[in-house]
Amino acid sequence: MAGNLLRGPPLLLRASDKYPRTPKCARCRNHGVVSALKGHKRYCRWKDCMCAKCTLIAERQRVMAAQVALRRQQAQEENEVRELQLLYGTAEGLALAAANGIIPPRPNYEVFGSVSSESNSDSSVQKFETFSKGQLSGPTTPQQAAGKSASAESDSAPGMSSPDGRHGGSGSENGDSESFINSPVSKPLKDGGETPGSVSSIGSDSGSETDKDEQEPSPSSAASRHMNAIDILTRVFPSHKRSILELVLQGCGKDVVQAIEQILNNSGAQGSNKAGPDEGWTAERMLQGAQQPPPPPAASTAPTRPLLPGAMTLSNRSAFSPLQPNTPHFGADPSTYPLGTHLGLNPLRLAYSAHGRGLAFMTPYSTTGLMPTLGFRPPMDYAFSDLIRDRTMLHKEQGYSGGLYGPLVNNTTEKQ
């Protein structure tokens, strides 16, 4: 009797006695076929079916997969927060989780959204007024621009900067102000007072600029970007003054790459005069250099005749350039080799660079057709004949009167 009470209904017993239910393919079920889902997805006959039922099943599967992934991510984040709370306490754990990016911090616009939406119109009107006043004030000198940039940096360091400091501190906005002063829109403002038509024209012309200003981040982020540019310049050029680097950056429109190129060009021009890194770096010269076009390339000013190997190093010349003597620089040029100790000749210059993979210019290859670099004319036509012709007085009395090149090349008469 007790066994009959503990036994369930016959229908449930019949279902429990059979094998457990296995998942079936929904696409096959839509088309009247029952097939187990395990190992069947790749070989399903209706895996690419686009009927209404199969499309609905595919959409449900996609939504379910997204929900499972989201729940899994949320569970992982909750576990991490719980571990941090156990390690550091409740408040410290939440702060550390927000700092590490586990919990996204609440943005500021959610707290101050209503206040910013209410004061949007007032800020736009104030921006128009400050913009027009900044344009009518006239172009500023480099010293004033440097002072304004310094004041803008000091004001924007805590994150609270005034609109005037913001407009006066950036070089790109100063350039826009100069172009705006030269535009015909600002002429009625200079001649007469501010009329409603002029104000509306200013608003219509500069509406895109105001939209850009509204879309830009806060002035503190702009100031931090400017500070990053100044820090980059000070690290690249530690020997230059910070004020000069600020002026160069402001003259180049906050473009760090252009400022670096400008400083390198000016320092290269000063290096020829043997001047120090800070000598001649005046604000006027820097601003003039930033506005002037770059100097023409050296190839345009080069003479038509090939340059002498002694005039510059052989590393930037072709290996097939003719050899010409440069006697004042023979001793100082690192690409010369003293061969006169054995052959009674002045030091011969290499046709290839000393550190390259070329062969040294040796005397057995100087005849026509054997010398690899000068094989088109006889040796007398080349300009290095006087190099061979000038022999030292020390070896004149030795047995090399005929020389390796004959009496005509050596410009001496054979001794009888």
UniProtKB/Swiss-Prot annotation:
Residues 131-226 are annotated as: Disordered. It is found in: Nucleus. Residues 25-72 bind DNA. GO terms for biological process: germ cell development; sex differentiation. Transmembrane segments: none annotated. Residues 131-154 have a biased composition (Polar residues). GO terms for molecular function: DNA-binding transcription factor activity, RNA polymerase II-specific; metal ion binding; RNA polymerase II cis-regulatory region sequence-specific DNA binding. PROSITE patterns: DM_1, DM_2. Residues 197-207 have a biased composition (Low complexity). Its main location: nucleus. Pfam families: DM (PF00751), DMA (PF03474), DMRT5_DMB (PF20624). It comes from the Eukaryota. Gene3D superfamilies: DM DNA-binding domain (4.10.1040.10), DNA helicase RuvA subunit, C-terminal domain (1.10.8.10). Residues 227-262 form the DMA domain. GO terms for cellular component: nucleus. Keywords: DNA-binding, Metal-binding, Nucleus, Zinc. The keyword DNA-binding applies. The keyword Transit peptide does not apply. Belongs to the DMRT family. May be involved in sexual development. This is Doublesex- and mab-3-related transcription factor A2. It comes from Takifugu rubripes (Japanese pufferfish). The gene is dmrta2.
